[in-house]
């Protein structure tokens, strides 16, 4: 029950009492108890985030077969290249467990995360061309959606600072990350919507 409202001068009209008891409209995402204090409400669930801040990048190479700008070979480009300033923060697209942090001459330093959505769907995300000293997670770490995990680099087979971003399905097969993000209604950090 709502507490009794009392006007500063001690009087309260029927009209003002009705306004005092009117439901409150919440425009953001609530957590914990509902506005009435009695029922639980669902917090933002299954929100997928773009890995770089809005307006910070340009997609310079899509998910496709292409001639590698480094090797000159025809290769499957299993992600998208997001050109961005060096050291732009990279965030986890969804909560999960870090399954790999490594470095090689082709990918530079990279992070791969395994995610399990609330419906049980498993997917993996990978973030390449970083510098090892900028990576903020290690294998086995649990990360939250939107958590900073590293920074844009120019390491490995790279012609300029960018994030090579991949999404893999439950069988670890690469899928088009741009289409996948759009299908899963990805938002930028700070643009969450209640569902």
Model segments located where?
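Short aromatic-glycine-enriched beta-strand elements
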Residues: 106-113, 161-165
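Histidine-centered divalent metal-coordination motifs
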Residues: 77-79, 129, 162-166
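Acidic, glycine-rich catalytic/binding loops that coordinate metals and/or anionic ligands
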Residues: 135, 141, 166-195
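OB-fold (S1/OB) nucleic-acid-binding surfaces
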Residues: 113-122
């Amino acid at each position: 029950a709502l507490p009794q409202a009392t006007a500063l001068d001690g009087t309260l009209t029927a009209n003002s009492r009705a306004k005092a008891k009117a439901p409150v409209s919440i425009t953001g995402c609530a957590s914990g108890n509902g506005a009435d204090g009695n029922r639980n409400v669902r917090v933002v669930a299954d929100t997928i985030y773009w890995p770089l801040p809005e307006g910070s990048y340009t997609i310079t190479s899509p998910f496709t077969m292409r001639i590698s700008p480094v090797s000159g070979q025809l290769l499957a480009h299993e992600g998208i290249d997001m050109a961005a300033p060096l050291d732009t923060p990279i965030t986890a697209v969804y909560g999960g467990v870090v399954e790999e942090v490594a470095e090689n001459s082709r990918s530079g330093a990279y992070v791969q995360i395994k995610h399990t959505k609330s419906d049980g769907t498993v997917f993996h995300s990978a973030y390449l061309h970083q510098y090892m000293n900028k990576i903020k997670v290690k294998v086995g770490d649990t990360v939250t959606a939107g958590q900073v995990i590293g920074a844009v680099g120019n390491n490995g087979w790279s012609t300029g600072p960018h994030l090579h971003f991949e999404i893999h399905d439950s069988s670890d097969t690469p899928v088009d990350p741009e289409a996948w993000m759009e299908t899963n209604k990805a938002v930028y950090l700070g643009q969450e919507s209640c569902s």
